[in-house]
Amino acid sequence: MLKITKIKRKIMNSIKIKLSLIANLIAIFALIVLGIVSFYFTKTSLHEAALKNQTDLLKVTQSTVEDFRSTNQSFTRALEKDIANLPYQSLVTEENIINNVGPILKYYRHSINALNVYLGLTNGKVLLSQKSNDAKMPELRDDLDIKTKNWYQEALKTNDIFVTPAYLDANLKQYVITYSKAIYKDGKIIGVLGIDIPSEDLQELVAATPGNTFLFDRENKIFAATNKELLNPSIDHSPILNAYKTHGNYNFFTYGLDGKERLGTCTKVFTYTACISESADIINKPIHKAAFIQVIIVIVVVIFSVILLYFIVSKYLSPLAAIQTG
């Protein structure tokens, strides 16, 4: 009789283990499927959030460039208006122009900290106020051949302000952006106003923006960046430029740089190309962290479920065991 009882107990224990195993396998499978689905949506959500963050950072840089241009254009219009509002007699002779326009040019140059502010006359001479020669009042010069300059010619072609791309000024030996505007009085051309702003001003504004953003000029050279190491002309930026040409404005792409995968996006801002780039590892780091946390949670839940289900199965099979032994 004792032997039969032991056999029955072994059978019941075997049933408990098998039922517990089946229940646990079902639970484990369900938890794994749930974990995979949850991770997929978490990964998608985190990835989209990372891309949106990068897009927002690039838009900050775009707004910075647009505000920089808008500020300088407003300044140019204000100066044009002050000169055009002078009595016509103040603008008919070179001496009158020097005496009446000269102080205005110097005042405006000081107010915006420009490198040069000048008025190119139709006879080829230019009234020039220079930061490098601040002690002197603006003087009239005829050795700069202004009629051949792009800022002079383009300003005469348009009724609006002409803005040059950043370029290396041969006299200043530094990169500048020129804002120019033709000035008319009573329907007659007085001259072309020019303002040279150092591109360093834009560089400082871009450097203060968040994210790894940078600006290419029309020759595809970086002249402004949050990371000044990118200004090194020896760095090959063709991978990101080629990827941008393929994908277009505000479309993300991956590219290789120094053997590492990077994620980037670009957009046109006037004549510039503004880009933001980040290591794919940095973008994926929160995703991998979330995956690790979810794996730990699934393992803990599986272990807890195995133990819990075993005791539940044991409890509900206990009456059956008592009947069989009784």
Label the predicted regions.
Residues W151-Y184, P210-F214, R218-E219, D236-F270, ...:
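Membrane-proximal, non-catalytic sensory/regulatory domains of signal-transducing membrane proteins
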Residues S20, N24, I28, L215, ...:
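Cytoplasm-proximal transmembrane signaling helix
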Residues I98-S111, K188, V192-L230:
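Solvent-exposed, extracytoplasmic
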Residues L2-K52, V295-I303:
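Extreme N-terminal signal-anchor transmembrane helix of membrane signaling/transducer proteins, especially
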Residues I4-T5, K52-V60, T64-D160:
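Extracytoplasmic/periplasmic sensory segments of membrane signal-transduction proteins
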Residues S20-L21, S38-L57, T61-F68, Q89, ...:
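Juxtamembrane interface helices immediately C-terminal to a transmembrane segment
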Residues Y179, G191-P198, L263-A290:
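Short, hydrophobic beta-strand elements of compact beta-sandwich sensory domains
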Residues H110-S111, T122, L128-I197, L202-L205, ...:
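Extracytoplasmic/periplasmic ligand-binding sensor regions of membrane-associated signaling proteins
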